[in-house]
Regions:
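Glycine-rich anion/phosphate-binding loop at the beta-strand->alpha-helix junction
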Residues: 172-264
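Short amphipathic alpha-helical face segments that pack within enzyme cores
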Residues: 19-23, 126, 130, 252-259
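Internal helix-turn-beta structural module
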Residues: 44-45, 270-272, 276-348
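Secondary-structure transition/capping motifs at alpha-helix termini
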Residues: 30-31, 265-271
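Short, charge-patterned binding micro-sites
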Residues: 38-56, 281-285
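N-terminal, positively charged regions that mediate nucleic acid binding
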Residues: 1-38, 43-44, 125
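Glycine-rich, mobile lid/loop segments that gate access to catalytic sites or pores
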Residues: 4, 45-47, 64-212, 332-335, ...
Length: 348
């Protein structure tokens, strides 16, 4: 069975927007942990637009935060970018339910874990993610921040079938140089996971990738939800994470679902585990909890669903407290995935 997952770099325009939105969120929570934040971002060329709802004792300097994100990513001439903000207070109707400890919206959220990697994450997704992290760490004067990676893994043969990376580069860099650098990263990542290096390697298949970032594509928050999670290996409820404070169950419940799935796999209850939590706006308890172990369970799925409800406080307030979600640096979640990073409480 061939399965493909992708990841995008911190310089991808959609990820630039996610990072700006989470920079605003983190700044608000640092100054006022009770902040209610729902920020969206759009970037095109050198123009940034932020819009959303914000109720906080702190008013963030969105322009300065956006410029700091661009500087950290390594965007050329980041000082020339302009920004505009259209932000109002949170709706009183939404606030009424959240103030009582209820969910900030309806919806279903998924968490997943698998024993196929040390990170308890899908292997092709981790390969794509590790490759882009290595590319980021290696980045020289030859390469620019925008990049994407895609890995096709053959689960029956236990080997990498295809490794694809497209990376932005300077105009004066020869494509042969780019291919040598990127191919070296592919091999390095494959060997780190004890895998074959005789895969099909595709580097910048169009032959040239000079114009990138927001000058090549418009970026918007919430458009890389599969790259944020599990690379397509499990289902997704559709809700994005970045720019949302933890009262939004789109974010907090997805983190708790990951923790439960991870705990169950570590406990030996299953080799693969997908948790679904579903909520109604304004209500504290989930309306349903579902466990799917894809036939790998050692404990009945119904019993695992009951265990999840007994062992974990699944109210929004309980999740926030258990995972310390008002103290998380969300800047570190906004690129290269929200899961499989050991520094976060939902990975512990």
């Amino acid at each position: 069975m061939l399965f493909t997952s992708e990841q995008v770099s911190c310089g991808h325009p959609d990820k630039i927007c996610d990072q700006i939105a989470d920079a605003v969120l983190t700044d608000c929570l640092r100054h006022d942990p009770e902040s209610r934040v729902a920020i969206e971002c759009l970037i095109k060329d050198n123009v940034i637009v932020l819009a959303g709802e914000l109720t906080s004792e702190h008013m963030p300097d969105t322009n300065a935060l956006a410029h700091e994100v661009l500087r950290r990513i390594g965007v050329p001439e980041f000082e020339s970018y302009e920004s505009a903000a259209f932000i109002t207070r949170q709706s009183r109707d939404i606030a009424r339910g959240v103030d009582r400890g209820g969910a900030g919206d309806q919806g279903m959220m998924y968490g997943y874990a698998t024993d196929e990697t040390p990170e308890l994450m899908p292997l092709p997704f981790m390969l794509a993610t590790r490759a882009l992290l290595a590319l980021r760490d290696l980045r020289s004067s030859l390469l620019l921040p925008d990049a994407k990676a895609q890995v096709t893994y053959d689960y029956e043969a236990g080997r990498i079938d295809t490794f694809l990376i497209s990376t932005q580069h300077r105009a004066d860099v020869h494509t042969v140089q780019v291919k040598e650098i990127v191919r070296g990263i592919m091999v390095q990542v494959a060997e780190a996971y004890g895998l074959n290096i005789d895969f099909r390697a595709l580097v910048n298949p169009t032959g040239r990738f000079v114009q990138g970032g927001s000058f090549a594509d418009t970026g918007v928050t919430g458009r890389k939800i599969i790259a944020d999670t599990y690379g397509g290996m499990c289902r997704h409820g559709g809700g994005a994470f970045s720019g949302k404070d933890p009262s939004k169950v789109d974010r907090s419940a997805a983190y708790m679902a990951r923790k439960i799935a991870r705990d169950f796999v570590l406990a030996g209850y299953a080799k693969r585990c997908e948790i679904q939590l579903a909520y109604a706006i304004g209500m504290k308890e989930p309306v349903s909890v579902n466990v799917n172990c894809f036939g790998t369970e050692t404990v009945a799925e119904k019993e695992l669903a009951q265990l999840a409800q007994r062992q974990y406080d699944l109210t929004p307030a309980g999740i926030i407290k258990a995972l310390h979600l008002k103290a998380v640096d969300y800047n570190k979640t906004a690129a290269y995935g929200h899961f499989g990073k050991p520094q976060f409480p939902w990975e512990q």
